[in-house]
Amino acid sequence: MATDWLGSIVSINCGDSLGVYQGRVSAVDQVSQTISLTRPFHNGVKCLVPEVTFRAGDITELKILEIPGPGDNQHFGDLHQTELGPSGAGCQVGINQNGTGKLVKKPASSSSAPQNIPKRTDVKSQDVAVSPQQQQCSKSYVDRHMESLSQSKSFRRRHNSWSSSSRHPNQATPKKSGLKNGQMKNKDDECFGDDIEEIPDTDFDFEGNLALFDKAAVFEEIDTYERRSGTRSRGIPNERPTRYRHDENILESEPIVYRRITVPHNVSKEFCTDSGLVVPSISYELHKKLLSVAEKHGLTLERRLEMTGVCASQMALTLLGGPNRLNPKNVHQRPTVALLCGPHVKGAQGIRCGRHLANHDVQVILFLPNFVKMLESITNELSLFSKTQGQQVSSLKDLPTSPVDLVINCLDCPENVFLRDQPWYKAAVAWANQNRAPVLSIDPPVHEVEQGIDAKWSLALGLPLPLGEHAGRIYLCDIGIPQQVFQEVGINYHSPFGCKFVIPLHSA
């Protein structure tokens, strides 16, 4: 009774721990209650062992996928089995990729003489006319469907890339019919249905193989070859190449020195430029001495006022919008700037800045209180300013009530601190705070107490003072002091301006 099932293709489910096995029954032992399968597949993957034996207690479910016919179980273990039909034609039994038997039509011929290849029409007629003997050697649709279910996705048949992708553009896609498609599948299996080689269960050791590669020896061999061939060597001491590549530096670059300016006293605050150069602050006494020595060497007050006015006006034009705001298309909306100046040298700097702004088609309103006696620099600047289209007012009531585009503050001077107690000064501070316009301070002093007008930007001259948070963002202006003048007052100076006359400073 047990021998009747030899050669059958079965599927054995051993639960979640062992999985599902498929194969052909090779032995059934009723005494020990075991069953053996040859060419087994475990969960769709071909096993490395040729035979697997199961106990009855391990089997959860057993399904019979195929029962051999009469006389088929005599040679079930062979790889190829041949049966002769009534017409003398044979069919060959092979093992497909999932291990189950597959019947492939192959005419048996005792002669090795070449055969004539039939035409395409003859092949079609032969495919349609199937003899009863050939039907016995072909599998049913259910058997082919069961084989496709048990086949693993990772072991699918390799396809011919030329046949699938290199079809002639004018060639029509063949229609798929049931009978013809099945015969084409069998022909593909004859060509591409080889058994897949066994895959080793050990992973490739990348680290171990990399350790076997001696890079030092290879590099030494390359260097030796280059020296013998006369080519440019790599890393040989006291040897210069004859030619340089286009991306090689001929001159070695020196290390960058970021601290190029040193002062003779302790620095209370340091700044840095966009390129990283350190700019130290100096005290008001040292700054005053620097301007005095520069004036003695020819940098007069008139020249200093002109440089300050030009740089401050350029910065103000940039803050107003630059070419986007000041162009012929925006004549109807000219920017408005309010100048708040005091009766001192810093006020004269603001008046000269206002004159340059007025020359650039900016509407300037200058506030300067009336005094009986003015400085000569103030008088000269007012004389030039009166020749522009700018407006001068001495009363805060004449200042615009609507917000302006920019307020330039030149009210404060460290030598005239008493002006902060004057009514006009307090009124000007109140107007600037109520106007809510951004404020630019030109050469602001250092105050122990907070200023009345908080600036958004501040422009320092030569070297910055240790300004606080009330000064806003600090900018530095080059007023043309020579390097030897800095050295005369004890400052080791190297220009941080580069190609500009006004540069921004950042807190270090």
UniProtKB/Swiss-Prot annotation:
Residues 1-68 form the Sm domain. InterPro entries: DFDF (IPR025762), FDF_dom (IPR019050), Lsm14-like_N (IPR025609), Lsm16_N (IPR034107), Sm (IPR047575), YjeF_N_dom (IPR004443), YjeF_N_dom_sf (IPR036652). The modification Phosphoserine is found at S131, S138, S140, S161. One of its GO terms (cellular component) is P-body. It is found in: Cytoplasm, P-body. The keyword Zinc does not apply. GO terms for molecular function: mRNA binding. Homodimer (via YjeF N-terminal domain). Forms a complex with DCP1A, DCP2, DDX6 and EDC4/HEDLS, within this complex directly interacts with DCP1A and DDX6. Interacts with ZFP36. Binds single-stranded RNA. Involved in the process of mRNA degradation and in the positive regulation of mRNA decapping. This is Enhancer of mRNA-decapping protein 3. The lineage of its organism: Eukaryota, Metazoa, Chordata, Craniata, Vertebrata.
